[in-house]
Regions:
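Conserved ABC ATPase "signature" region
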Residues: 76, 90-109
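Helix-to-loop junction immediately C-terminal to a conserved catalytic motif
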Residues: 11
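Catalytic Walker B motif of ABC-type/P-loop ATPase nucleotide-binding domains
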Residues: 138-142
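Conserved ABC ATPase signature
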Residues: 113-117, 121
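Conserved ABC transporter NBD signature motif
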Residues: 19-40, 46-54
Length: 217
């Protein structure tokens, strides 16, 4: 198991060669949870995407900061699946984007190109894109990379607020910070070791991983 492949499997971009990934779904018309898996056919994938929406914040260094797009456009792009390819975003979409921009503390930067943003501002814009569709799950890949410690504290405050409305999977090399912020831990290094709480001792880490590890919380 490698981090990138695992994330793609969770997001439904890859199908696991063995085993399955289950998504717990509760609909408004049926309070009894159902489980969908991503080893499904294309039509079942469509059902999964419609019933279990996911948001994704990619790793910072995968973003092309020269791409000519504004903060507002980045956040609106999180609603692209709610319109056709040729139609425009509606007034409702733009109002939702305005609310997310305010929540991310980006008022006044709506028309600014992403290349002119600080690292923290760009991360907030990308986080806004990930949550604007009200997903059931948000996957965050190294969200604190390239941001200063002051904004890192604010980032985790935002994530705690968002976690009231949806599940979060956070990928990080920063073991110390992750252990303080999350409810459970999965250590990934070819194999995956899951811990239902954050009780991962330094001795356990040294015994089982004699190289840098990645944590999913």
């Amino acid at each position: 198991v490698y981090k990138r492949q695992l994330i793609k499997c969770i997001l439904g971009l890859l199908k696991p060669t063995t085993g399955e990934i289950l998504y717990r779904v509760t609909t408004a018309s049926n309070n009894n949870p159902a489980f969908l898996d991503n080893s499904a056919t294309n039509s079942q994938f469509s059902t999964l995407n419609s019933q279990f929406s996911m948001g994704y914040l990619p790793q910072y260094n995968s973003i092309d900061r020269k791409f000519p797009i504004t903060v507002e456009e980045v956040i609106l792009s999180g609603l692209s699946s709610q319109k056709s390819l040729i139609s425009r975003f509606t007034a409702t979409h733009r109002e939702k984007a305005r609310q997310v921009i305010a929540r991310m503390g980006l008022e006044g930067l709506e028309k600014r190109a992403i290349g002119a943003l600080s690292g923290g501002q760009l991360q907030r814009a990308l986080l806004g894109r990930a949550i604007i569709s009200d997903p059931a799950l948000v996957v965050l890949d190294e969200p604190s990379t390239y941001i200063d410690k002051r904004f890192e504290a604010r980032l985790y405050e935002l994530l705690a607020e968002i976690n009231h409305d949806c599940a979060i999977i956070l990928v990080s090399h920063d073991i110390g910070t992750v252990l303080q912020q999350v409810k459970s831990i999965a250590c990934v290094n070819e194999t995956l070791d899951y811990h239902p709480d954050t009780g991962v001792s330094e001795e356990w880490l040294e015994r089982n991983f004699n190289c840098p590890i990645e944590l999913l919380g």
